Amino acid sequence: MKAEILCVGTELLLGDIVNTNAQYISKELANIGIEVYHHSVIGDNENRLLKELERAFNYCDLVITTGGLGPTKDDLTKESVAKFFQEDLVLHEKSLKQIEKRLLCFNKSMTESNKKQAYFPKNCEILENPNGTAPGFIIEKDNKIAIILPGPPYEMQPMFENKVIPYLEKLTNCTIKSKVLRITGIGESDVADLISDILESQTNPTVAPYAKQGETTLRITAKANSEEKALNLIVPIEKEIRQILGDNIYSSGETSLEEVIASILVKRNLTIATAESCTGGLLAGKLINFPGISSVFLEGAITYSNESKINRLNVKKETLEKYTAVSKEVALEMAEGIAKSSGTNIGISTTGVAGPGGGTYDKPIGLVYIGLYINGKTFVKELNYSGNRQFIRNITVTRALDFLRRNLE
């Protein structure tokens, strides 16, 4: 089965709202083995929407739309889909009562505009929306399936998970399970080379690598006639991949790198403080995303100038003069200085040239040092990257977290 995701809303085209719906739906469809053929974004215009539906169904069996189900005149998705399938819109009394009840929760009364949200194509399956006033629906006709969902993610995602996925799993006539392995420290091409034999010989399960900034994910997907059999198919492939990639795999599922590290720190009761120059607080910000980190994260210092490194972290003036701020020697003194002044088990530091200016022949843009102090032991890592300022800062944070992880495990 091939699918297209069609996100409706002029606000998406104008860039006022980030289109997270397409990303979420693509990921969920991949989990159940449905190929996403195309993504589209279109404004609130009936003629364009009809043309887009016509084009999409020339290539796909399934079109999933989000947005355009609101109460205003420019919310036209439902009307356009009904016209495409040559269906009349009829009032659904149960939905009308649910919308009215929902409005009462906000001390609002039913209006004619809201009543519009209770009209649906005559022959469709209605998807209740306990989180808003816009129910979705599924319509099947002439070997075409359209799944129409509300735009707000907090309404769309529960509806997709609770209603759409069970519906689609029945259509595929088999159980599909996936396991995601998260990898950092090596790039996507290196991962692909290392597991090339697995990638070239894959049938069921399939193994698909995906890259994003600073890490790679591997999705192992198996099909079988039961959940147990599908999961059993994944086990030997996962084991083989883990043997090849080793500690480059930092987690599975949705667990992020900072969550892995924060869990280790909390579990072992290891306190930590950060001293940042080029990353400007991004490293501390990643760590404090984790609930409960306050028990071990004591302090974060942004020491951008040489004076602040000397006064706050006790970096020696002679070290700065001899080696400059961007050096392994200064990175180590920063890490040790923040740990000792904060009274923590661990100190971690970043110093480098993020650009766009400031680079020299000896200290080019993209040169970064990560310093690490753990209970009296010190470690340092040199990085060299090309890219813009934001990329260099973000990749430094990822590499710093990974450097810490590897020295804790």
Curated annotation (Swiss-Prot):
The family database entries (Pfam families) matched by this protein are listed as: CinA, CinA_KH, MoCF_biosynth
The record's section on InterPro entries has: CinA, CinA-like_C, CinA_C, CinA_KH, Competence-induced_CinA, MoaB/Mog-like_dom_sf, MoaB/Mog_dom
Q: Which family does the entry's similarity section mention?
A: Belongs to the CinA family.
Can you name this protein? Answer: Putative competence-damage inducible protein
Species annotation: Clostridium botulinum (strain Okra / Type B1)
- What gene name does this entry carry? cinA
